[in-house]
């Protein structure tokens, strides 16, 4: 092994490594002569870098605790706001119910307009009785349904009135009264249309009787038809003994068929008028309920009016007291003298000491 000589003073400075060491290869003779002077050098130490998968750790427990505390306070804030959220939810439910009732009212108004157009027709041959009866039945069912929905909405307002404010409850009652007034107006229009339809049916019946009475009276019945015997009006005796044709039998059958048709028509019109009368009676019950609701609102308005009158009396009493005090102040001459003296003293002080 060939010994090497390291120049430590040139490559290190107070224990700091300055770079690669400079070594010098010595000959064997030189190595033998200097072996007594230089001790053998230790093997060079190689620096091993840390493994790449090793990571530094940091304690983040406090951050986790602070995040938990913030989440807990947020949940507590949500719990404290639950009454407000409940009130908003109830208000939105009331709004949806009122919106649904308003939409149903508009649809029923459209059906009522169509029924009005059909009911005002006075033509005898352009009478759409089936369509009119269907629309009448549908509108009657819609009015009953709307009446029930408005009653449910009013019960909802009464049940939730204690939880909401006074102004909010007044606004809700105003909306309910507005819907009730619209339903009453529509019911009144429906009643008027049914009355017009009844008058038209009476006119059509009288006109049909006028047109059908003359042929019925002009064509007499055969005397043996109701007795069940054979109808024989006459037969001519010819030499060829031909069979006589009975023409009166066909006329009599047509006459009876016409009478049956008239009876069925009159019966159908009677049923229609009965339905109209029952519908008018139901509308009367709806008007009674509406009158009861309006009576309740009238009592509320009377209480508000009494409160306004009481407040007005209090304001007038306060005004009279203020006038009395003002008169007493103006009549007090000593007070005016004192004020005048204070002004004079203030003027003298201002002129003498501050000028």
From Swiss-Prot:
Known outcome of mutating residue 245 to A: Loss of interaction with SEC24C
Residue ranges that the Swiss-Prot or TrEMBL entry lists as coiled coil: 287-318
Compartment(s) of residence: Endoplasmic reticulum-Golgi intermediate compartment membrane; Golgi apparatus membrane
Membrane topology: Single-pass type IV membrane protein
Domain of life: Eukaryota
Membrane-side (Cytoplasmic) residue stretches: 1-333
Side Vesicular, residues: 355
Keywords, ordered alphabetically: Coiled coil, Congenital disorder of glycosylation, Disease variant, Golgi apparatus, Membrane, Transmembrane, Transmembrane helix, Transport
Effect of residue 138 to V: Found in a patient with childhood apraxia of speech; uncertain significance
Name of the protein this chain belongs to: Syntaxin-5
Organism field: Homo sapiens
């Amino acid at each position: 092994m060939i010994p090497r000589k390291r120049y430590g003073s040139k490559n290190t400075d107070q224990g700091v490594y300055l770079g690669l060491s400079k070594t010098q290869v010595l000959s064997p003779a030189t190595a033998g002569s200097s072996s007594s002077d230089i001790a053998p050098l230790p093997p060079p130490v190689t620096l091993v870098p840390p493994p790449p998968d090793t990571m530094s750790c940091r304690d983040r427990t406090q951050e986790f605790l602070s995040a938990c505390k913030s989440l807990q306070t947020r949940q507590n804030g949500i719990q404290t706001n639950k009454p407000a959220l409940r009130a908003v939810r109830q208000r939105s439910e009331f709004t949806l119910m009122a919106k649904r009732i308003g939409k149903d009212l508009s649809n029923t108004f459209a059906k009522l307009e169509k029924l009005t157009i059909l009911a005002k027709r006075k033509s005898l041959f352009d009478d759409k009785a089936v369509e009119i009866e269907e629309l009448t039945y549908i509108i009657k069912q819609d009015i009953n349904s709307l009446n029930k929905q408005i009653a449910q909405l009013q019960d909802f307002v009464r049940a939730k009135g204690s939880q909401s404010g006074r102004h909010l409850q007044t606004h809700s009652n105003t909306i309910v009264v507005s819907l009730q007034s619209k339903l009453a107006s529509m019911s009144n229009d429906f009643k008027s249309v049914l009355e017009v339809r009844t008058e038209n049916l009476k006119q059509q019946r009288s006109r049909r009787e006028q047109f059908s009475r003359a042929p019925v009276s002009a064509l007499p019945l055969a005397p043996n038809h109701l007795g069940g015997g054979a109808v024989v009006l006459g037969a001519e005796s010819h030499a060829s003994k031909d069979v006589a044709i009975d023409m009166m039998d066909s006329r009599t059958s047509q006459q009876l068929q016409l009478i049956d048709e008239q009876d069925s028509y009159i019966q159908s019109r009677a049923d229609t008028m009965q339905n109209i009368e029952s519908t008018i009676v139901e509308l009367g019950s709806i008007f009674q309920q509406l009158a009861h609701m309006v009576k309740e609102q009238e009592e509320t308005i009377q209480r508000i009016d009494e409160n306004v009158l009481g407040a007005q009396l209090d304001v007038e009493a306060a005004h009279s007291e203020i006038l009395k005090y003002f008169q007493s102040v103006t009549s007090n001459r000593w007070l005016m003298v004192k004020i005048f003296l204070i002004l004079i003293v203030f003027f003298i002080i201002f002129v003498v000491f501050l000028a």
